[in-house]
Amino acid sequence: MIELKNLTIGYQQKNNEKVVASDINATLHSGRLTCLIGANGIGKSTLLRTLSAFQSPLAGEITIQNPSHAPILISARPMTRSQEKVLSRLIGVVLTEKPDVQNMTVFELVGLGRSPYTGFWGRLNNDDKQIVAESLQLVGIESLKDRLIQTLSDGERQKTMIAKALAQQTPVIYLDEPTAFLDYPSKVEMLTLLRRLARETEKTIFLSTHDMELALQIADELWLMTKDTSDATDLIIGTPIELATNGSLSHFIDRPGIHLDPKTLTIKVTNCQ
């Protein structure tokens, strides 16, 4: 479980702070697929980077429950090396960028997920290799294990990066736009896979996406970043049905000619002639 308490996210700009969103209080639960949605530029990437400890919060804190040790706290205070090492065994991150690797096989790249345990240049023992093989199997790409990364399709490459995160054996996986650049069937397959992994492995899986209708159909929970009446960024949390019923999704989605059907959770386009 991950708890956000009075969290303020943003950037340090010379002598002042650029606040993106403040007073965020929320909880991410294990065994669920949670999708972060919202307009371009509203701060989804900033929130994801803060959760991943790639940048520090401006205020507040993030508490990550640790099955093996004491909880890890992410705050404005810099983390120690020992805390960073523990964090690498708690959080796996899958980014949108293509991996900058050449002449590396799928098995070798997924094997890098074991580096928190072996060191970056560490050799994989038999247990590590078994974990890599199981990760490939969970994602359904065991037949690709000997393929070079540069020969993969976008969908195959994305599955490889997810397998790498699984091989890291973290209880938490964050993904930034995992369905970007995929065709529609591959988008459905990817989100369905992530939901299945969350449920089967009891992991906390949290991702940002612009694939609104798929998120409505597949996510267990939605985090909707939106602007309130005072133009401050607000975070609305609930199941797709809950956010459809209370009008939050319609307020975000509906435009002239674009309408959310709250009963079917589908987006309808009219007057497109």
Predicted regions and their residues:
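Helix-to-loop junction immediately C-terminal to a conserved catalytic motif
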Residues: 52
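H-loop/switch region of ABC-family ATPase nucleotide-binding domains
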Residues: 209-210
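The feature captures the beta-strand-to-loop junction immediately N-terminal to the Walker
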Residues: 37-39
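Conserved ABC ATPase signature
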Residues: 148-152
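Conserved ABC ATPase "signature" region
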Residues: 111, 126-144, 169
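ABC ATPase nucleotide-binding domains
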Residues: 241, 251-273
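Catalytic Walker B motif of ABC-type/P-loop ATPase nucleotide-binding domains
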Residues: 173-176
